[in-house]
């Protein structure tokens, strides 16, 4: 049973890491969402009567404009000739730059509401979470939307009642193994049906033909094809060609139906697609999307005075046409202007004047209204901050030049322009754009106003956890006497006063609930540290007993060096390979001279070092899967033969069943992969077999074993290894199963080497070996993830393996399967650490507890390495670094419980062999 202190440690650790995992989103990536602003109309005279927004989900800018070699037909041609023809003759075009996360919800919110949701928005789901702020659709007369059930409902349900109509297909349509074109065909088919229905419904015709309407076509086909077959596949290219053909037909039908030229068209995408069929991170292939606008109110293409070439667009053959890039949120302002609607009150988009066909004074007025709408947000946000601060420091830029002065100068210029001083128009536009930029910077200033205060709290929380958890480690595993700690009156006074004062500050600042939790943990931790300072002092002395001061300095320096090296390894995985090769000499350095075992350790270390040199983003390889699976089976059989004297008939039967499950899973995986690669869909029998084997191997087989468990630690490790092998195989894309095999072998060899070193070392009063084991264990904890991936690929997992079980899109179950695959190496490591506790004759969980108490050194590093500026790829990597560091600690806490179960009653001595006869 766990002691009271250990139970508190586990519960506090889990809660602490869960809340602090979220802290970066509350501190660094908070959207400046405010309510209560008044509306600002974009323009008095709408250039267009209606607008069509066509969004190709997952469509890359380069694919839209490049000349492409089709992988099947061999044709070398443009995929979207009609769109290109518009760019050359009718439209204004550019690249729309999205922000991270490059997912569908944030992308659509940016272009339709003009608002960048915070990074955590990707966790909000889809139709279950309608947007809780104003949008362009909400400002339209009426919006008719067609497409995916993942996107349409969040704008329909979040808008004014009866403002948005939606025609959606069912989720069963989103089958990654079927033709993605059918998803887009549904959209075009239903909008044409809507037009046809007006022939027998005059009320509908009147409604559809009223000014200010919006038609939203969400085309999911490219995203589906990209996920299934990659953006360089025939399926993806054919989907782009289909969209181009249908857009041409749509334009013809729209002109025919409305019988005028007063329609504006916007063609764009919510995000791009990586070369490996994923999106979510800040890679340029994910953040660069096409933007083509034509029709009423839109400029014709502008010729460059001299062709402009760059590496990205060199194959577009559009160097003579001016390219006008925008930020994704700018699209909302453009669309609002085109139909004369109010700017969405939360929009931070800037009206892209290069797209507009209008006199300069009209452009200026529309831009000025845009600036006033953004300024309105700043003023409302500022009042919120003033009301929640004891002392308010005004935004520096508006101290130098007050916003009232900006408004007066711009209004004065507009009046002079109206009187005929047209030469002032460029100055007025420049000043208006400056006001918008300063205001947006001011919004960022207000959003981060309390950064220093809350970051100090979080820092004290991390430091408090590190010291508190280390004191728990000392109390439970180092000190051999009880301490009756009681809080003194001084403790109650100091921390009671701090609790009241700081909580009142948060209350006065109208802080969210999470902020109170960020404060709660450091107060609790430091109160306990202050109370148990004698435990900490005595424990450190005992822990380092027998180690001289110079050696202590060297030891601490070495620990810091290793941990900081791992910080750098998060950015460059090859550092893991370097450390593995250095560890190959670890037994020799420690005086272990078994050359056979040392040679095997050296070979295994060299093998495992290879994985962090391989590309973290993988391409499906059935050959690698089969070879690795064969090696897993051979390793299991070898282990079975080696341990056969330790097995009774019951355990032997369990082993045979587990090996058979591995073989059956290989067969099911092969059938699934071959069928999916041949574009014939997922065979039902292979899908059912995959699920059955996965459930049986993960749940049923462990239960069967624990009915009559074999308590030999080697047998138990082999049982655990085989338990997860089928799951790892079906979720493997290429070399991951190799890693699973080598990683498991490395841990087993490490256990044996450490136990031999323990036998060679006389009993001493210090804990050198424990420190060494903890450092290596912490290193392996990080490698459990980096062996098969990196932080830049966390949001870019290929879904190839998941299709073998779930061909129809369902993000949360798919994500759950990927998480299971991720945590399996952690479970293997946790079991290995548990066995090491036994082999080294130390208390259960000693090693893992010391790892947990030091691992947040990484978390604190990455908390301050977070970036909020620069490329979205860099920002995304820093977010992922922090999350992975926190989750590593959290995994160790949770997996302690798992290890407690899987290693129940494990013994180092040989078990009594039962009769070979069955009952």
Swiss-Prot record:
Reported EC number(s) for this entry are 2.-.-.-
In the bilayer, the protein is annotated as: Multi-pass membrane protein
Q: Which residues are glycosylated?
A: 138, 196, 201, 285, 311
Subcellular location(s): the record lists: Endoplasmic reticulum membrane
- What pathway is this protein said to act in by its record? Glycolipid biosynthesis; glycosylphosphatidylinositol-anchor biosynthesis
Q: What is its main location?
A: endoplasmic reticulum
Can you name a GO cellular component term? endoplasmic reticulum membrane
Question: GO biological process: any one?
Answer: cell wall organization
Q: Which GO terms describe its molecular function?
A: mannose-ethanolamine phosphotransferase activity
Show which residues constitute the signal peptide.
none
What Gene3D superfamilies does the record point to?
Alkaline Phosphatase, subunit A
Q: Tell me the residue ranges located in the Cytoplasmic compartment per UniProt.
A: 1-8, 478-487, 532-558, 620, 675-686, 740-773, 837-845, 904-919
User: Which regions span the lipid bilayer?
Assistant: 9-29, 457-477, 488-508, 511-531, 559-579, 599-619, 621-641, 654-674, 687-707, 719-739, 774-794, 816-836, 846-866, 883-903
Segments on the Lumenal face: 30-456, 509-510, 580-598, 642-653, 708-718, 795-815, 867-882
What are the entry keywords? Answer: Cell wall biogenesis/degradation, Endoplasmic reticulum, Glycoprotein, GPI-anchor biosynthesis, Membrane, Transferase, Transmembrane, Transmembrane helix
The source's superkingdom equals Eukaryota
Family in the record: Belongs to the PIGG/PIGN/PIGO family. PIGN subfamily.
Do you know which PANTHER family this protein is assigned to? GPI ETHANOLAMINE PHOSPHATE TRANSFERASE 1 (PTHR12250:SF0), PHOSPHATIDYLINOSITOL GLYCAN, CLASS N (PTHR12250)
Q: What does this protein do?
A: Ethanolamine phosphate transferase involved in glycosylphosphatidylinositol-anchor biosynthesis. Transfers ethanolamine phosphate to the first alpha-1,4-linked mannose of the glycosylphosphatidylinositol precursor of GPI-anchor.
Q: Could you identify this protein by its name?
A: GPI ethanolamine phosphate transferase 1
Q: Which organism is it from?
A: Kluyveromyces lactis (strain ATCC 8585 / CBS 2359 / DSM 70799 / NBRC 1267 / NRRL Y-1140 / WM37)
Q: Which gene encodes it?
A: MCD4
């Amino acid at each position: 049973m766990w002691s009271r202190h250990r139970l508190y440690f586990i519960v506090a650790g889990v809660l602490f890491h869960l809340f602090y995992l979220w802290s970066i989103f509350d501190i660094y990536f908070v959207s400046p969402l405010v309510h209560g602003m008044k509306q600002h109309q974009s323009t008095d005279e709408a250039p267009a009567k209606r607008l069509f927004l066509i969004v190709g989900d997952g469509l890359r800018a380069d694919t839209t404009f490049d000349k492409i070699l089709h992988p099947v037909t061999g044709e070398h041609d443009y995929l979207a000739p009609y769109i290109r023809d518009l760019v050359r003759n009718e439209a204004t075009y550019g690249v729309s730059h999205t922000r991270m996360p490059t997912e569908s919800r944030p992308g659509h919110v940016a272009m339709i509401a003009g608002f960048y949701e915070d990074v955590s928005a990707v966790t909000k789901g889809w139709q279950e979470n309608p947007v809780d702020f104003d949008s362009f659709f909400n400002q339209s007369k009426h919006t008719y939307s067609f497409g995916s059930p993942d996107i349409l409902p969040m704008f329909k349900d979040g808008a004014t009642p009866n403002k948005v109509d939606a025609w959606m297909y069912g989720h069963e349509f989103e089958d990654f193994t079927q033709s993605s074109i059918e998803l887009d065909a549904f959209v075009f088919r239903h909008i044409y049906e809507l037009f046809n229905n007006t022939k027998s419904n005059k009320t509908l015709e009147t409604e559809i033909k009223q000014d200010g309407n919006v038609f939203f076509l969400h085309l999911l086909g490219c995203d589906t094809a990209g996920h299934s077959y990659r953006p360089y596949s025939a399926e993806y290219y054919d989907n782009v060609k289909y969209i181009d053909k249908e857009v041409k037909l749509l334009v013809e039908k729209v002109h025919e139906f409305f019988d005028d030229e007063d329609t504006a068209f916007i063609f764009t995408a919510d995000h791009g697609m990586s070369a490996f069929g994923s999106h979510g991170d800040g890679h340029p292939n994910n953040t660069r999307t096409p933007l083509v606008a034509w029709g009423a109110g839109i400029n014709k293409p502008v010729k460059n005075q001299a062709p402009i070439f760059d590496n990205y667009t060199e194959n577009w053959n559009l160097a003579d046409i001016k390219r006008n890039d925008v930020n994704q949120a700018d699209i909302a302002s453009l669309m609002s202007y085109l139909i004369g609607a109010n700017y969405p009150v939360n929009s931070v988009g800037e009206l892209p004047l290069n797209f507009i066909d209008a006199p300069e004074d009209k452009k200026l007025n529309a831009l000025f209204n845009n600036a006033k709408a953004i300024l309105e947000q700043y003023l409302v946000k500022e009042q919120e901050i003033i009301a929640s601060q004891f002392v308010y420091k005004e935004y520096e830029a508006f101290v130098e030049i007050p916003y009232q002065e900006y408004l007066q100068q711009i209004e004065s210029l507009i009046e002079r322009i109206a009187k005929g001083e047209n030469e002032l128009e460029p100055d007025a536009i420049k000043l208006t754009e400056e006001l918008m930029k300063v205001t947006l910077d001011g919004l960022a200033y207000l959003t981060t106003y309390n950064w220093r205060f809350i970051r100090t709290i979080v820092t004290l929380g991390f430091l408090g956890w590190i010291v508190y958890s280390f004191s728990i480690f000392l109390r439970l595993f180092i000190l051999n006497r009880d301490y009756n700690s009681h809080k003194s009156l001084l403790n109650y006074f100091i921390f009671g006063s701090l609790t009241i004062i700081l909580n009142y500050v948060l209350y006065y600042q109208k802080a969210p609930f999470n902020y109170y939790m960020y404060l709660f943990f450091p107060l609790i931790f430091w109160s306990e540290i202050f109370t148990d300072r004698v435990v900490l002092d005595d424990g450190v002395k005992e822990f380092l007993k027998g180690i001289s001061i110079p050696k202590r300095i060297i030891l601490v320096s070495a620990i810091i060096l290793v941990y900081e090296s791992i910080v750098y390894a998060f950015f460059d995985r090859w550092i893991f390979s370097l450390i593995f090769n250095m560890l190959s000499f670890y037994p020799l350095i420690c005086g272990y001279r078994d050359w056979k075992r040392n040679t095997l350790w050296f070979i295994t270390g060299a093998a495992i070092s290879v994985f962090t040199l391989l590309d973290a983003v993988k391409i499906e390889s059935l050959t690698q899967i089969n070879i690795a699976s064969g090696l897993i089976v051979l390793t299991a059989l070898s282990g079975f033969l080696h341990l056969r004297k330790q097995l009774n008939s019951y355990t032997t039967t369990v082993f045979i069943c587990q090996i058979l499950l591995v073989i059956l899973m290989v067969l099911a995986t092969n059938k699934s992969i071959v069928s999916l690669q041949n574009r014939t869909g997922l065979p039902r029998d292979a899908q059912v077999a995959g699920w059955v084997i996965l459930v049986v191997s993960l749940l049923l087989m462990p239960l069967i074993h624990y009915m009559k468990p074999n308590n030999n630690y080697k047998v138990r490790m082999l049982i655990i290894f085989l338990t997860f092998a089928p799951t790892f195989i079906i979720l493997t894309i290429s070399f991951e199963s190799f890693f699973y095999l080598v990683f498991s072998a490395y841990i087993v060899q490490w256990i044996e080497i450490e136990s031999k070193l323990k036998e060679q070392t006389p009993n001493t009063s210090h804990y050198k070996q424990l420190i060494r084991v903890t450092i290596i264990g912490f290193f392996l904890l990080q490698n459990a993830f980096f062996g098969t991936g990196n932080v830049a690929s966390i949001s870019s997992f290929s879904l190839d393996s998941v299709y073998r079980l779930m061909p129809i899109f369902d993000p949360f179950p798919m994500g759950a399967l990927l998480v299971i695959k991720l945590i399996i190496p952690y479970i293997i490591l946790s079991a290995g650490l548990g066995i090491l506790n036994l082999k080294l004759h130390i208390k259960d969980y000693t090693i893992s507890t010391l790892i947990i108490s030091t691992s947040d050194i990484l978390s604190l590093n990455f908390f301050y390495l977070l970036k909020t500026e620069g490329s979205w790829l860099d920002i995304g990597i820093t977010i992922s670094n922090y999350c992975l560091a926190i989750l590593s600690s959290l995994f160790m806490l949770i997996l302690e419980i798992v290890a407690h179960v899987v290693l129940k009653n494990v013994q180092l001595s040989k078990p009594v062999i039962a009769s070979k006869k069955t009952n």
